[in-house]
Amino acid sequence: MGFKCGIVGLPNVGKSTLFNALTKAGIEAANFPFCTIEPNTGVVPMPDPRLDQLAEIVKPQRTLPTTMEFVDIAGLVKGASKGEGLGNQFLTNIRETEAIGHVVRCFENDNIIHVSGKVNPADDIEVINTELALADLDTCERAIHRVQKKAKGGDKDAKAELAVLEKCLPQLENAGMLRALDLSAEEKAAIRYLSFLTLKPTMYIANVNEDGFENNPYLDQVREIAAKEGSVVVPVCAAVEADIAELDDEERDEFMQELGLEEPGLNRVIRAGYKLLNLQTYFTAGVKEVRAWTIPVGATAPQAAGKIHTDFEKGFIRAQTISFEDFITYKGEQGAKEAGKMRAEGKDYIVKDGDVMNFLFNV
């Protein structure tokens, strides 16, 4: 599994349309608030042309992409942090994800009602972010109350945690995002168990009309907000993506050519999510299967091996490693080996994105 990204937004911004296109799950996207109550989950393959290039050389029995999970979380509304509009359940569902894809409506359409009567991305973002911040404020205050007693008793870990929580508190009181705070890795680790919603990596998915990718003041608003808090923006037209998702490969390529698109916008959403979580891919390439594996950036060779099986990590000896570029240039493992491009990497090797690896282990 790659990662779990929760898709959030106000009702009627195009969340379920986007989710349907992402997963081809075909859940009902009714023009009505709260048509999604239980979160719908879809597992989506990670688009990576490198996998096909490797398969062309190796000719395996099958190819397996890495995947990620998208969760369509029901439309949040003002007051969700106090339980309005089924809010408590929604917030719990978001808490269980690793990242947030916040869909924002950046198009006019009289046939699709807007919950507040007008299209205003800045207001929409503020409503959602305020609800998330209020939920986090409640979590933070409870944690401070709980940790204070231990800290007074001289508990070092409790003191460290309390210091971080007291840094977070004023930010949340002002409905600010914790991800905009400059927290160190140690500080984040101290409060990780609390699963703060506003600390989760977030991308804004700007849902635009077919002609709304340029000269769109709504889109500009979203970009401005994202820049201030260090988030990314991915513009897509959910309606077009839904059409593309229904086509077979040949029709899809033709349709995208007509629209002047190089690839479905959803590929950008998936890749942005991947990057957001600091993930990368390595490959295994054998005649039985060519496969992509997800690891965090900075993972060592044994940690990468452990993704396949824990025994590979426990008994790790070394990793026969070829860069993706060399594997393609020299037409596979044998050619790369003959050209002196296969390396034997040890326990301290930091895996690079695209490495083609074969692990030697002994248990």
Swiss-Prot record:
It holds the Pfam family MMR_HSR1. Residues 3-256 form the OBG-type G domain. One of its GO terms (cellular component) is cytoplasm. It comes from the Bacteria. Changing N12A: Shows similar hydrolysis activities in the presence of K(+) or Na(+). The keyword ATP-binding applies. Changing K78R: Retains K(+)-dependent stimulation of ATPase activity and differentiates between K(+) and Na(+). GO terms for molecular function: ATP binding; ATP hydrolysis activity; enzyme inhibitor activity; GTP binding; metal ion binding; protein homodimerization activity; ribosomal large subunit binding; ribosome binding. Residues 278-361 form the TGS domain. InterPro entries: ATPase_YchF/OLA1 (IPR004396), Beta-grasp_dom_sf (IPR012675), G_OBG (IPR031167), GTP-bd (IPR006073), P-loop_NTPase (IPR027417), TGS (IPR004095), TGS-like (IPR012676), TGS-like_dom_sf (IPR023192). Keywords: ATP-binding, Magnesium, Metal-binding, Nucleotide-binding. Belongs to the TRAFAC class OBG-HflX-like GTPase superfamily. OBG GTPase family. YchF/OLA1 subfamily. This is Ribosome-binding ATPase YchF.
